Amino acid sequence: MMEIDKYKNLRYRLMESEKWPLKYMFKFIVPNEAGKVDQVKALLPKGGKVTFKHTANLKHVSVTCVALMESADQIIVITEKADKIEGVIVL
């Protein structure tokens, strides 16, 4: 139930924006294991500017993507899919 509320809140905040398409920044903390970074990268919009930063101990990778998005629903779909990958933290 809490997860649904989180996305409802995000959708509401996004819908407050009157300017679509808009630049949106996705940010995820991803375990540096078993292709999980590639799984997250595959979800990101094509043409987005993606950057990676490893933690000091190399256990996690911060994945950031700034992309022009057409709708709140597009953003929610990507966020939900990333959140389902084990160990991924959505920021």
Task: Please annotate each region the language model reported.
Residues 1-62, 66-91:
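Long, contiguous binding/interaction regions
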